Amino acid sequence: MGILNLTPDSFSDGGKWNNFETAIHRAMEIEEQGAHFLDIGAQSTRPGYVAVSEEEEWNRLKCVLKVIKNKVKIPVSVDTFYPEIARRAMEYGVDIINDITGCENSKMFEIACKYNCGIVINHNFGNLEIKSFFEKKLLESIQYGLRPQQICFDPGIGFNKTRNQDAHILKHLKEIKISQNALLVGASRKRIIGACCGNPPPQERMPGTIAAHTIAVLNGANIVRVHDVKEAVQALKVTNFINNTD
């Protein structure tokens, strides 16, 4: 899953893709480089972020979404915690809702059910009670009419967690994963990578990101969310080839 941030203040690439032309170019490039999904966000969720309004988030998204859906063939997700933004994005043909709050607002389930779209549910707490959270959210989503195949879980690397907690999660993904649901991991350029490597700037954390995501895939992750698509695709092709060879 390739990341496209339309924000001026994201922790690693803020301001890089936040005008119309560069955003469209990057979306097409992400697909060309081999991503299976495109995740578009217009709200920075870096540590200590201040949320922008629903109106501001939609102003950043609306023109780009409409064009991108006509330019790329891979499924597109919208990274938002506002139900109304998710609903509007569905009207533009977006395929997946990616909610970092873990669908704290149950309207997200109603929207996903109405539009028959995918939904990513993120664990956003500073504890390791992740599987029980996933099980609770799975039951809740089914009660709203969603099918298990629509639901993807994210253990929330870097969301209110310590470096050791993040490492524990990556090491124990097989124990966290629910077999009937896809598992997404997003460690790209995050604090755990920096903390292990002398805290280089986020843009210099690609090798560490690849190491973390390789471990994640070997431990059961189905999707990894990345900034550096070309390099991640190559690394995971090699990982999967070796892992699947007798």
Model-assigned labels for residue ranges:
Residues I40-Q43, D154-I157:
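Glycine-rich beta-strand-to-loop/alpha-helix junction loops that act as flexible
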Residues L38, P75-V78:
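Flavin-dependent oxidoreductase catalytic cores
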